[in-house]
Each structure stands twice: as C-alpha cells, then as structure tokens.
Amino acid sequence: MYNFNEAEYRTNLTRQIDTFGQGVELAKEITKDGYSNIFFIAVGGTVAMMMHFEEIAKQLTTIPVYAEQAGEIVLTGHRHLNRDSLIIMGSKSGDTKETVAAAKWIKDNYGCRIASMVISKESPLGRLTDYQLPLVVFKGVEYEYLSVFGLFYGLLHLHNDFPQINAFEEQLKKLPDLLVAAQAKFDAPAAKIAARYYQSPYLMWIGGGELWGEIYLFTMCILEEMQWMKTKSIKSSEFFHGTLELVDENTDVFLVKSVGAARALDDRVERFLNQYGKNVVIIDIKDYMGDIDDAFAPILAPVFSTAVLNGRLSKYFEKNTGHDLNMRRYYRQFDY
C-alpha cells in the first residue's frame, strides 16, 4: 500500500488497544466517587470525534452525555454542568488554546474532575487534568477513539448499560488485522477516487448516524485544512431539506454509509443519488468491517471509517495534488 508502514501501524494499534483496561480502571474509580453526567468538550476534529460518543450514548444509556464546543461553552455556559459532572477533553498537543481555556474555566468555576486524551501530562491541558487517557501516537484518529473506549464503556458497564464489555474487548483485539485488511481493500478504490476528484472545485459529502462526526472531521480537518479543497458536509437526515437542490450532472457527491440505526437514512440518499446524480461515490463502511459482530458494528464503524478515509483516501489526495498534508497557510502559523 502507498505510504503505509504496516508493521508500525500494527504495533501502535496493539499498544493502544492494550490501554483499554487502564480506562476501565479509571471508570471504576470515577463511578465509586460518583458523577452526575458526562461532558465531552473540545474543538475541531477532536470534538467531531466526540460526537460519536454522544450519539451512541443516546441509544445505550440513561447517563446524560453531551458533546460541547470548548470555545462556545465558556461563553454560553450549560445549566446541566455542575461540580459532579465528569469532563472528558482532548488535545493531542495539550496546548489547543480553546480547550485549555475551557479546562481552566471549568476548574475555576465548578471544580469538576477532568479526564483528558493528551500525550503529555506536563502540557497545559495535562496539568489541568485529573485522569490522563493514554494516547500512544500523535497522528491517527483511530487511536483517539481507542483512547476513550475503556473509560466510556467502562462507565456504561458499571451503570448496567453495557454488560458485554468483555466481548467488546475481545473484538478490539481483532482490530490490527481488520484495519489493515480494510485499508488494503480500499487502497485501489482510494487511488482511483483521488485521481478522478482531486481537482474538483467542490465536493459534497453526506453521512449520518454514528459516522456524522467522521464526515464532518474528514471534510473540515483533512480536505479543507490539509488539502485546501472546498467541501460541503451534510447529514443524511438533513439532505432532503435543502442540499438536494445542488445535485446535478456536474456535482461531485460522496455518500459514506453508516451501519447502525440511521442506515435507512443513508439508503434513501443513495437511491436519490443513483437516480439524479452523475458523479457519485458510495463508500459503505460495512464493506470494510470484516467479521466484527453486529452488536459492536455501530460502535466501531468510525474506527474503520477513519482508517479508510484518513488512512487511504487522504494519502492519495496528497499524492495527486502534490499538497503535503502537513502544509498550512494559517493554522498554528501565527496568532489570530
């Protein structure tokens, strides 16, 4: 596969999966001390990743779970935020200014416990963190999901909402093989897609359910930030309430199909696109998940989505555009 170090990828995934038990132990400590609700708070791609947990929580638990934008919550507040709230934050660098400011605001105003997905405990966010969620590498969103899984599903298990936690952990052990296989399967399609669409003036991306955060993340953080490509992301549930009018024979449209309860919405969009679109790419994440148990497929779908989209398609866009994924005009280049 192009620009892919399989041995390193397998090693890092295994190291990250091995931290699952640490997250469960944190969940035991937090549950023993008690908590009233869970707030996921971050910005950008990290809060996009967190949207998945909010969506899954609606379906699995009565624990109130919120995903909030760090730059907004310090201005608007939240009536459900209280001293007993558990805050889950994330900033790989540990110095994302809005996230650090939100952590300080939370500590100063509420004194909440904060669990953070951060590499260094000595970073600005790390120093405000009570529980560090292990993160073994800087790049790769799949590692971010895996970093949070132990704590989140440990909390749900201890709340009697996720009795299948041991079976879930066994599923995680399959991921090194299955994620490599998924990327190998999508490698040739990714090369063809990128070669055809890398010069597109406008890319529409549609998705929903447990994958909505992934669609938002890939369009904004990868295609826009890292490739300077103009995109539109829209939920499958919202597509028929305006955005459908933009579809014609010249519109480049991507639909990423989810595997959970909202899949029927993706199916409806697919039928419309097949009838009225000309330049349509359908990426069905279910096709890349191997023998993952159906019970865990919605939980793990974003891990596979990020593996094929970020892991394969972004690399081929980079190859075709000649635009290094690390190049920025503005982001972190100066104060603004």
Map each language-model feature to its residues.
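Internal helical hairpin/lid segments
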Residues: 213-281
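Short amphipathic alpha-helix with an adjacent loop that forms part of the alpha/beta core around
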Residues: 27-31, 75-82, 243-248
